[in-house]
Amino acid sequence: MSDGTAGSYSGVERRGLMFVLSSPSGAGKTTLSRMLVEQMPGLQMSVSATTRPMRPGEVDGRDYYFVDRPKFDEMVGAGEFLEWANVFDNRYGTPRAPVEAALAVGRDVLFDIDWQGTQQLRSRAGSDVVSVFILPPSVQALEHRLHTRAQDSHEVIRGRMKKAGDEMSHFDAYDYIVVNDNIGVAFESVRSILRAEQLKRERQVGLDAFVRGMRQQLEG
């Protein structure tokens, strides 16, 4: 049945969710995020605002909203962010309006943010947030990945390794933990988590009326 009445399946609409991936640098969250967006219909990447300089190949509004520090502070004061944080001397924040618009029409929004941002997001959005922490299989594997991706200097890598311990200390604040020893296996784990969360009863708007309508037909 698809006539749009309360008792038809078309009357059930799913509210979107905020799906958070966090990890130390090099553990794989960026790769997993890209794979999820490519293979999961209805999932979109959250676009953050940042004060850091634009890198070669990046596009304003697609990769980030690039703003200066005064503009960022103005947005903070106006309550325009769901979360924001200082990361390596730059500021990052998630604009509220596009996320809320996506959730309202049943789209899921993927966040690549740290523990600090995740806590802020959960305090503002509650059960709309599902969080996953990605762990490396070992410290040695993490350091090897940072070196082989050849994006950072040795000094920056040392800083990221030092920060990794602090980031991992917050693993127990997350809903799910995935160890990324194999990117394909880790992806299937993360995708399964998202699919299960999409089907949770409390996200199905109109489900009570749908079931009630069928019961009335059966009892009538």
Curated annotation (Swiss-Prot):
GO CC terms, sorted: cytosol
InterPro entries in alphabetical order: GK/Ca_channel_bsu, Guanylate_kin-like_dom, Guanylate_kinase, Guanylate_kinase_CS, P-loop_NTPase
Residue ranges of domain Guanylate kinase-like in the record: 16-195
Reaction equation(s) it catalyzes: GMP + ATP = GDP + ADP
Keyword Repeat part of the UniProt annotation: no
GO MF annotation list: ATP binding; guanylate kinase activity
Localisation: Cytoplasm
Gene3D superfamilies assigned to the protein according to its UniProt record, in alphabetical order: Guanylate Kinase phosphate binding domain, P-loop containing nucleotide triphosphate hydrolases
EC identifiers of the protein: 2.7.4.8
Binding site for ATP: 23-30
Keywords of the record: ATP-binding, Cytoplasm, Kinase, Nucleotide-binding, Transferase
Membership in a protein family: Belongs to the guanylate kinase family.
Function as written in the Swiss-Prot or TrEMBL entry: Essential for recycling GMP and indirectly, cGMP.
Protein name in the entry: Guanylate kinase
Species whose genome carries this gene: Rhodopseudomonas palustris (strain ATCC BAA-98 / CGA009)
